From Swiss-Prot:
The enzyme's E.C. designation: 2.3.1.282
Gene that specifies this protein: papA5
TM ranges: none
Top EC class of this enzyme: transferase
Protein name: Phthiocerol/phthiodiolone dimycocerosyl transferase
Catalysed conversion reaction: 2 a mycocerosyl-[mycocerosic acid synthase] + a phthiocerol = a dimycocerosyl phthiocerol + 2 holo-[mycocerosic acid synthase]; 2 a mycocerosyl-[mycocerosic acid synthase] + a phthiodiolone = a dimycocerosyl phthiodiolone + 2 holo-[mycocerosic acid synthase]; 2 a mycocerosyl-[mycocerosic acid synthase] + a phenolphthiocerol = a dimycocerosyl phenolphthiocerol + 2 holo-[mycocerosic acid synthase]
UniProt-listed InterPro entries: CAT-like_dom_sf (IPR023213), PapA_C (IPR031641)
Domain notes: Consists of two structural domains that are related to each other.
Record-linked Pfam families: PapA_C
Amino acid sequence: MAYSTSVIRRLAPSEKFFAETQTFTSITVLLDGTVDIDAMADAFDALLEAYPVYAGHLEPDSDGGFELVADDLLHPGLWVQFEGDPAPTDQLDQGVALIYLLVKPDSTPVEVTLFIHHSLADGTHMAGLLFELFARYTEVVTTGSAGPVSPNPAPEPIETVLEQRGIRKQQRSGLDRFIPAMFAYELPPKRVTTRSAAERPAAVPTTRCRLSKAETSSLVKYGRVNRLFVNNLISAAILLAEWQVRRTPHIPIPYVYNVNLRALVEPPVSATGCTLAIGVATYLAHITPQTTMVELARGIADMFQADLADGVVQQSLLHFNMQYEGAIPGLPDVVLSTNLGNAVAMSTPPGLEVVGVQSQFYRASSAVIDVYSFGVVGGELLIEHHVDAAETTIDLIRSLLRSVVSEHQH
């Protein structure tokens, strides 16, 4: 049987890589209480009505790219997984849908996981959808209705957002900062993975650590005393840990990190108005045994402000695509991170409380992925390391951050 389809648009260059690797990103909300499955299904249906593009799918086009396609098929709906059931994540399929929802009602704590295709959503976009899902769920539980629904158009790619605002490609990309380190050192072997090429998306192993609310608060205060944001300190801790485990003290470390552009362009962009509203900032870290976390964090912060003032960060994705795999020839292994931001209180009905949040990548590729993500959830700092090679740094990062917290407290 043939179903009618219509092409919404082609994927832009910034989005294409994640279609090639079939990458889905997930956010899992950990909950204390009971989730009403029927109410969550109603809220999810309302979310799909409000953002119908995610009920569509991707199809290869004739030019080696991908098209975003709408069809008349119903979305398969949410998954419910009870203890002992097989995981439904092997059904993630960009040729069927671009969003999925999984509820584990009898796990402790209860888990609700939203999966979205990474071509169509960065972390901020995903958080916007997740917060709306829980707002509608709260409405269903407390009033019996998910609230009014007005369909939203498909989000624009970053290329269109920049063009509409007169932001054009400059000479510099930001990666030019790494040129002095290219082919300048005898490099150790590149990290490898035992993963074989997969036809369907598979979970990338993820290691996590947290700081308590008190530790996170102390870290924020420590940053203020030193005129630094927490993300600068976390970036410095990640780089110091990488420097220690690499055992190549004379080789600088290239650092690449995402920057949310939504509030940095005029007019600003809404959370769900653009697929990947990110720029890329870079830093080449020259670390010695005498390098302090504050010194390194200030170097990162100062370089970012300079590149932002010059407009380099805003137009960076017009030079290259954001990728989580592969290596630049002749360059030491790049450290890549993404800042999940500070999650404000999510709407929940009485008797249901958010006790944690975590993220995961699912992808079909045999290349090494190595990316850090971090953010503040419920007042607690969460740091994640998504890597399908040996993980050696997460405990060290936590230890480094706790050491400055302890220093500040005393």
